[in-house]
A protein has these predicted regions:
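Metallocofactor- and cofactor-centric catalytic cores in central/energy metabolism, strongly enriched
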Residues: 1-409, 416-419, 424-496
Length: 496
């Protein structure tokens, strides 16, 4: 079993794949270094002398600079490494020399649902979407009271509550309206009840305009203040929606029609070595089969955005990526926040030292394929292949944004563990085996076997593709079995 990994030949640190005790001789890539102190799993150890102010190199990239001299065998972490990041950067387009679509592969088949507009779906559910937080509990009671309608091919009746839709103005309200309308359009929702209170800022006419053309049999509206008994009214509407949703049956669909979101959270020092490269390889494999993937968490690209921007398929896509990256930095600066204050306490405990360290691991989820498009918050994926999406690092906000973009399911890597799920089925992928064993009720797939020396990234990626096909065909994720699913909306404005 390997003790550590030297990710790039030019790195001046290695990453401990397992805890390394002080005095242990570590041999990797022809290097022999004795640990001068205990090195926790996922943390970095110097393998070359690093002087005060010199860059610490991991993934072949500077992840910060040393704040004190360090000899080989020294633990390199927050006590002796600091970020190099500052504010906005002027980027230039330097396309990678090998920038080209990956060779195509015949797509496998999954058993999904074909909607009347031609789109594919992997779930056949009825959703209740409240437009304002005032009706949240009403929506929950409607779900509880109408579970008898979940029969035949209908796989669930759910609501996605939130505190917004009123006391918002301008761009902030428009962003909420856009996100909710995008959820209404999601193909996994066979039928949707949009639930209004009546007096909220987010008015019915505004929402219908935002929604655009829609199937009147698939989407129904109810304004609670307009009826004597909203529960009786909802019962009648939900019966109609159930009759509509029940006509869909699973049928063979090529995986080329899948849209898969990619996210990491509760990351550790192994995220960029095991789980995220596995997801990246999966992304390449799905792209080769004609499918689409979505990468977001813009603040967790800071410091590693060059890896992605040089892979933009053309200059127009590069310009959109540049605007997205610097636009998000300006969002931070406008709120008097530094752009590099990101790694959480859990990230640091797991071995992530700086935002560059976190970002270099995060972008591994993007694989090697060209970036085909950059889309805004609440916008749909319209281009096959790898897409970048405007969204924050926050787990639930970004997972909701990927769902709104049309992701059928989400791959979520974690080194610390998290139970949540977006409205789209959310597969939890552990970076290390101890987490998979400890939280077996949360984790769907373990890539810690890479660190254990049992499997290669190619093997775990193939296993992940097989699992995605099974989940797309109806196999439930751990979170689905627990009934976990929720949304969170990206708010950026005052509260009236």
């Amino acid at each position: 079993m390997p003790q550590a990994i030297h990710i790039s030949p030019i790195d001046n640190v290695v990453v401990a794949l397992h805890p390394i005790a002080k005095g242990t001789l570590v041999e990797v890539d022809g290097l022999s270094v004795t640990a001068l102190e205990d090195i926790p799993q996922g943390h970095k150890m110097a393998v070359k002398p690093i002087r005060n102010g010199e860059n610490v190199i991991k993934y072949g990239f500077p992840i910060g600079h040393a704040t004190a001299d360090a000899e080989p065998g020294t633990w390199m972490h927050t006590h002796n490494v600091h970020t190099n990041l500052s504010g906005e950067v002027e980027y230039s387009y330097n396309p990678a020399p090998d920038l080209a679509p990956l060779p195509k592969v015949a797509p496998e088949i999954f058993m999904g649902f074909r909607r009347k507009d031609g789109r594919a779906a992997i779930r056949n559910e009825i959703w209740i979407i409240p437009t304002v937080g005032c009706v949240n509990d009403i929506a929950k009671k409607m779900v509880a009271d109408n579970q008898d309608l979940v029969t035949g091919s209908i796989e669930g009746l759910y609501t996605f509550t939130h505190p917004f839709g009123c006391s918002q103005t301008g761009h902030d309200q428009a962003q909420t309206r856009k996100l909710l309308a995008a959820l209404v359009r999601h193909p996994n929702a066979a039928a949707v009840l949009v639930l209004h209170l009546g007096c909220e800022n987010l008015q019915h006419d505004q929402f219908v305009e935002e929604l655009g053309e829609y199937d009147h049999d698939r989407v129904k509206f109810l304004t609670c203040q307009d009826v004597d008994d909203e529960f009786a009214a909802a019962r009648s509407i939900l019966k109609e929606l159930a009759a509509y949703a029940g006509q869909f049956q699973r049928e063979p669909i090529p995986v080329s029609e899948l849209v898969v979101g990619m996210k990491c959270g509760g990351s550790d020092g192994l995220s960029g070595i095991t789980a995220n490269p596995t997801i990246g390889r999966f992304s390449d494999m799905l792209g080769q089969r004609g499918g689409s993937t979505v990468l977001t968490e813009v603040p967790e690209m800071f410091g590693a955005e060059g890896f992605l921007m040089d892979r933009c398929i053309n200059h127009d896509v590069f310009v959109k990526a540049e605007k997205m990256i610097n636009g998000f930095k300006e969002y931070f600066i406008s709120h008097n926040e530094v752009v590099y204050d990101n790694p959480s306490p859990g990230n640091k405990q797991g071995g992530i030292t700086t935002l560059e360290d976190k970002s270099c691991g995060c972008v591994q989820k993007g694989g090697t394929a060209p970036i085909m498009d950059v889309i805004g918050y609440g916008d749909p994926v319209v281009t096959k292949g790898l897409n970048m999406l405007y969204g924050p690092g926050n787990d639930l906000v970004s997972a909701t944004a990927m769902t709104a973009a049309g992701a059928h399911l989400i791959l979520f890597s974690t080194g610390r563990g998290t139970p949540f799920s977006a409205p789209a089925p959310t597969l939890k992928i552990s970076t290390n085996t101890p987490l998979a064993e400890k939280k077996s009720g949360w984790i769907d797939y373990n890539t810690g076997v890479i660190a254990d020396g049992e499997k290669t990234i190619d093997e775990t990626a193939q296993g992940l593709l097989d699992l995605v096909i099974r989940v797309a065909s109806g196999e439930q994720t751990k979170a689905e079995k627990h009934g976990f699913r929720e949304i969170s909306i990206f708010k950026d404005g005052v509260v009236l």
